[in-house]
C-alpha cells in the first residue's frame, strides 16, 4: 500500500507569488544613464562616412523587426545627445519615454511593456581608430620646402573679370596653396575659385606674330581644370 505527501494549495500559491515578485523586481531594475561614453575599437579602420552609413542603416531597419517606433525615435535622439555630451538631455529623453535602463546604458533597455531594445556601440560613440575625412578645401597642405631650396617666380593669374593678378609661385606649390594666396590678395574665398590652365600646341611657338590662324588656334589650344592638390607644370604656365 503506497502513500503520498501533499502540499497545501495556499503555500504553493504563495511560493509562486514570491518567485514572480522577485522576477518582476529584477526586470524592473532601473539605473540612471551613465555619463561615460563607451570606448571601442573597430575590427578595421573606419572612416567618418562609413560610420554614418552604418548608423543610418541601423536606424532605418531596427524598427522593422521589433519594438515600437516612438521608442526607437526616443532612443535615437538620446544616442545623439550622448555623443554630443549632453547627458541631461539624454536622461530627460529616456525618462520622458519611460525607458528602463537595467545597467545605466542604452546598449540594453526596456519600454513600459517589457520589450527589450539593444543599441550597438557604434551608435553611441565613434571607434578609437576612426579615420577623419577631409573635404576638398580643408586639411593641412603638404609641408613646404625650406626657403633656401624654394625657387620662386611671379605667376600671372587672370580673373574672370579680366583683371590680372601676380602671385609668388614655385615649382612645388599646389593649387590649394595658390588659392589661399589669391584669397589673401583679392579676398576671393578658396571654395569659390576655379582654376584652369591654358595649353597651346607646340607648333604655335614657331609662328611669327600676326600669322596666327584664328580657326586653327581654336583647334590647337584648350583649357584644363585643376584640382586642389594639382601641382602645376610650370613649363606650360605663364611666367612673368
Swiss-Prot record:
Q: Which InterPro entries match?
A: DC-UbP/UBTD2_N, DC-UbP/UBTD2_N_sf, Ubiquitin-like_dom, Ubiquitin-like_domsf, UBTD1/2
Q: Where is this region: Disordered?
A: 1-48
- Biased composition (Low complexity) is annotated at 12-22
Task of the protein: May be involved in the regulation of cellular senescence through a positive feedback loop with TP53.
What is the organism of origin for this protein? Xenopus tropicalis
Pfam (any one): ubiquitin
Ranges of Basic and acidic residues compositional bias? Answer: 28-42
The cross-references to SUPFAM superfamilies, in alphabetical order and at most eight, read:
Ubiquitin-like (SSF54236)
What is the name of this protein? Ubiquitin domain-containing protein 1
The Ubiquitin-like domain covers which part of the protein? 153-228
